[in-house]
Amino acid sequence: MAPARLYAIIDVEFCESRGLDVLDFAREVCAARPACIQLRAKHNTPSDTLELLRSLIALARPHEIQLYANDRPDLALLAGADGVHVGQNDLPVSLVRKSAPNLRVGVSTHNESQLSEALELRPDYVAIGPIYSTLTKQDAEPSIGIDGLVLAAQLARAARIPLVAIGGIDHSRARQVAAHADLIAVISALLPPSGRLQDVRAHVEEFIANLDPS
């Protein structure tokens, strides 16, 4: 398996809770060149989310970073994003494919049953988690641990669909998780211990380097 790559989730609520401007934070994250970024704006209006997506495209494209919208294929299309990420209670992958055939589609799963069902739908990637307990998401499912991740990796590899690991992954855990996933998705781990915007790029670059087991 090739070294895992970083899937950076730009969460509006997280940024606001830390006193960070979303676009300033995203600019520093993009400068570190993760493989993907996703905009997570659960409580924004559709118009605000669309505006943010368009701004993020301008930040991501120069670095050849894929941009995903969370939950909303309609906004992803309007903004010109690369794809959309849907959860268990969002539009099913099949409907997203019909309405937006050119969008890449990723889907969240939380256990073996959900993962198996998702793999049958042939999304562009499946996310599994939380791997560890997390405080970023208030209604998080039970953590599956490394054993659960190993099983998920076997199923995803057999289906030849990339696997994204998410949930409670920090610098100390990243390399162990990276041994079993194609991409590592994080929110709070993007922010350095200093909490300072000027330290974000170097911090994220270090995180990405830490994913390589060599």
Where in the sequence are the language-model features?
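Generic structural marker for isolated residues within well-ordered, non-membrane alpha-helices
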Residues: 93
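Terminal recognition/anchoring or ligand-binding modules at protein termini
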Residues: 183
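Histidine/lysine/aspartate-rich catalytic loop segments that bind and position anionic ligands
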Residues: 113-142
